[in-house]
Amino acid sequence: MKQVVVATKNMGKVREFAELFERFDLEVKSLHDFPHIEEVEETGETFEENAILKADSLSRQLNAIVIADDSGLIVDALNGKPGVYSARFAGEPKDDQANIDKVLQELNEVAFEKRKARFYCALAVAFPEGDKKPVIVNGTCEGFILEQRRGENGFGYDPIFYVEEYKKAMAELSSDEKNAISHRGRALRKLEEKIPEWFLGE
C-alpha cells in the first residue's frame, strides 16, 4: 500500500486526510509516526510559500510523498491579520484560546457587518523524486467573526467563525457539514481530483 505523509501532529487534520485517502488505498501517516523529525520553520510570507517549504523539506528528509497545509484566518477589518501568523497570533506557545481572545479584543468596537473574514488553506504536495516539482491547491471559506464563542466542535478559530449558509458557528457544525464548506474541505476536493495523476501515476 502506497504511503502519504501528512505534515502535521494535529489529529483533527490527520483524520480529515485519512478519510479522503482510504478510498484510494493510500495509507496516511502523520508526524507522530516520525518523532525524530524536526518541525520545519514556517518563514514564508504567504500560505503557499509555507506549505511548499514544509512539504519539500519533509519529503526530502523522509524520502516520501508529503502533503503539507498552511491555513489560517484572514480578517478584513484587521488588514488581513492574523494571516500566516494565525497559529501563533497571541505568541508562543500555540494556544487556540489565547488566539481567539486576541482576535475578539482587536475587533472589540467593530460592528458585525464589518467583521467579514475568511479561512484560507493552501495544500502543497512534494515528491521525493527530484525531477517532480511540488504542486499546490487551495480553498477558502467566507464568513464573519462572532462577538463570542459558540459550539464545541472543531479546533482553532472555529468557535468564533460564523458561516452564513448554516447560520451557525463553524464549531457548531457536524464534521460532514464542516467538510462540505470548509477551506480545507474545498482544497481537499481539488486535491482529490488530482490523486490518480499525482499519487497513483495514472
Curated annotation (Swiss-Prot):
Record: residues binding Mg(2+): 41, 70
Matches recorded under Pfam families: Ham1p_like (PF01725)
The entry's keywords: Hydrolase, Magnesium, Metal-binding, Nucleotide metabolism, Nucleotide-binding
Active site per database record: 70 (proton acceptor)
Gene3D superfamilies associated with the record: 3.90.950.10
Positions of substrate binding: 8-13, 71, 155-158, 178, 183-184
Cofactor: record remark: Binds 1 Mg(2+) ion per subunit.
Family membership: Belongs to the HAM1 NTPase family.
Record note on quaternary structure: Homodimer.
Protein name: dITP/XTP pyrophosphatase
Organism: Bacillus anthracis
